[in-house]
Amino acid sequence: MKKPYRKISDYAIVGGLSALVMVSIVGCKSNADDKQKEQSSLSQSVQKGAFVILEEQKDKSYKVVEEYPSSRTHIIVRDLQGNERVLSNEEIQKLIKEEEAKIDNGTSKLIQPNTNNGGSNEGSGFGLGSAILGSAAGAILGSYIGNKLFNNPNYQQNAQRTYKSPQAYQRSQNSFSKSAPSASSMGTASKGQSGFFGSSRPTSSPAISSGTRGFNS
């Protein structure tokens, strides 16, 4: 009776395939870890505070025209005439609660498919609540809503559309990335998500200043 045997070349092929699989796994894990560190770093910088300017559009919707890191969170609303005012904490919390209810019942523009096939930012119809939650300030003030948003693919696209232009969005990303702590000072990075909503949650809500300067709400 002949004993079964394998050629040395067979084992070499199997060994080579195993090595390729291991290299692929390690490479994917490394890329995922780098992405997690980047998003966690961005999330941490956002939690410190954000200065956000929302501008009213002709269709009565609102867009983020400027935002950058700040020691305190401020949300300024600018109307069509150029008048500005700082939203009070009470107003912001009310807007966020109203938007959260829309998210829960599926009517929020943030989680609906983008039907604007023309590619223009005009007419997207984001209200104040949607614009706030799509901005950096939303990641701070509405962090508890994050679990309802950051796994939604429509939100990932719509959050960028809350900005007035691609340039405004890119400026925001760059400014928060520059202020983010380095990976060496962060320790182990937690799992991150795209957009401003990350897995980290601020320990306390940043103070928000309030005031009125001629904007009729």
UniProtKB/Swiss-Prot annotation:
<feature type="lipid moiety-binding region" description="N-palmitoyl cysteine">
    <location>
        <position position="28"/>
    </location>
</feature>
<dbReference type="InterPro" id="IPR020913">
    <property type="entry name" value="UPF0323"/>
</dbReference>
<keyword id="KW-0732">Signal</keyword>
<keyword id="KW-0472">Membrane</keyword>
<feature type="compositionally biased region" description="Low complexity">
    <location>
        <begin position="199"/>
        <end position="210"/>
    </location>
</feature>
<feature type="signal peptide">
    <location>
        <begin position="1"/>
        <end position="27"/>
    </location>
</feature>
<feature type="compositionally biased region" description="Polar residues">
    <location>
        <begin position="160"/>
        <end position="171"/>
    </location>
</feature>
<keyword id="KW-0449">Lipoprotein</keyword>
<protein>
    <recommendedName>
        <fullName>UPF0323 lipoprotein HPP12_0232</fullName>
    </recommendedName>
</protein>
<comment type="similarity">
    <text>Belongs to the UPF0323 family.</text>
</comment>
<feature type="compositionally biased region" description="Low complexity">
    <location>
        <begin position="172"/>
        <end position="185"/>
    </location>
</feature>
<feature type="lipid moiety-binding region" description="S-diacylglycerol cysteine">
    <location>
        <position position="28"/>
    </location>
</feature>
<feature type="region of interest" description="Disordered">
    <location>
        <begin position="160"/>
        <end position="217"/>
    </location>
</feature>
<dbReference type="GO" id="GO:0005886">
    <property type="term" value="C:plasma membrane"/>
</dbReference>
<keyword id="KW-1003">Cell membrane</keyword>
<keyword id="KW-0564">Palmitate</keyword>
<feature type="compositionally biased region" description="Polar residues">
    <location>
        <begin position="186"/>
        <end position="197"/>
    </location>
</feature>
